């Protein structure tokens, strides 16, 4: 078990290296790293090559990981104050890896939804510090309209796939469900602490392999209590979710079908 899990101390020790705006890549391509060096150093250190992020976890770190990855681009906050000063939204990327070996049905279901664009414009509706950050079900959280095909897949249920090989610790992906068995659909959580009491109640189907610093930032957002849920006061939006494939050396490439879609879009 210890060989599969990074300790909280190890995760917190990793130096954060991330862009603070979704436009950083475009700004960097336009030469802003040189033209506007001070601003870009603070806002876009990753795109400007000022720092390097911690390497993504690979199979050498966790043998249960399969090759697929999902990159979530999220943003939150931002406002236009009464003084006329605009506060830009915060931005970050979280990379998910998957345990096909222990939860094959759940993993394939989630990846299918991502490939269909199901999590684009969805939200992280629950942020309970030290417990979970939960992604809303596809049918309930999206701002964009849904196709009939997506709606059909989103309401499909998956069986519980419990195992003793992993436990609910920070970074694990845990499938949401109702009280009855085998009722998971499309909502899932990223675990933010040690929650072993969830073992054998909710399916663990993967883990966060990159972007723990972004999760730590999310834990600092202002929240409100609604029933049993601790929810962010402002919407935390998933701008996009894309399936990629690990190259085994800390890098990612577009999955073949995603690459073909990008060609069509261009």
Predicted region positions:
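Cleavable N-terminal signal peptides of Sec/SRP-targeted secreted and luminal proteins
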Residues: 1-13
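Amphipathic alpha-helical interface elements that mediate macromolecular binding in regulatory proteins
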Residues: 2, 22, 42, 46, ...
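Secreted, short cysteine-rich peptides and small extracellular cysteine-rich domains stabilized by multiple disulfide
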Residues: 20-52
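Cyclophilin-like peptidyl-prolyl cis-trans isomerases
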Residues: 12-14, 26-32, 52-266
